[in-house]
A protein has these predicted regions:
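Amphipathic alpha-helical assembly/interaction segments
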Residues: 1-134
Length: 134
């Protein structure tokens, strides 16, 4: 059964899809950078996007049964959040170096900002969801 677009909510798993979308978009953008900057700009950016995707997948793979497992899940989400802010800095540097099209940078940063919001929201929901575990 279809849901009217205006009535749809975000899925609880949206942060994984957005991380994947960010990973793919970052690699596509890095492939267009000049080859002489591969080791200085492209590889670190692609690696950062890869780590973000890996960390959210790792966090999602943990089904907490106690507070220790909740903390492990939270640690992965915190790492993903830190990498997202790292990626913001790298996008800014790449924009200064290569003069990336404004619309392209805006689209890229919108994905990053959305992922930051989703990861923080997931951490907040987890805090409420798992507060009564032993």
């Amino acid at each position: 059964m279809s849901v009217i677009k205006s009535k749809r909510d975000e899925s609880e798993m949206e942060f994984i899809y957005t991380a994947r979308q960010l990973h793919i978009h970052t690699i596509q953008k890095c492939a267009n950078f000049p080859k002489r900057y591969t080791f200085y700009v492209s590889q670190p950016m692609a690696a950062c996007a890869t780590r973000i995707h890996e960390y959210v997948k790792c966090a999602n793979s943990i089904y907490p049964l106690n507070q220790h497992e909740v903390q492990i899940r939270r640690d992965y989400l915190l790492r993903a959040n830190a990498e997202l802010y790292n990626l913001v800095s790298q996008i800014e540097v790449a924009n200064e170096l290569f003069g990336i099209d404004g619309d392209s940078v805006k689209f890229w940063m919108d994905i990053v900002e959305r992922e930051i919001r989703l990861v923080k929201g997931t951490m907040k929901k987890d805090r409420e969801r798992y507060k009564n575990l032993p």
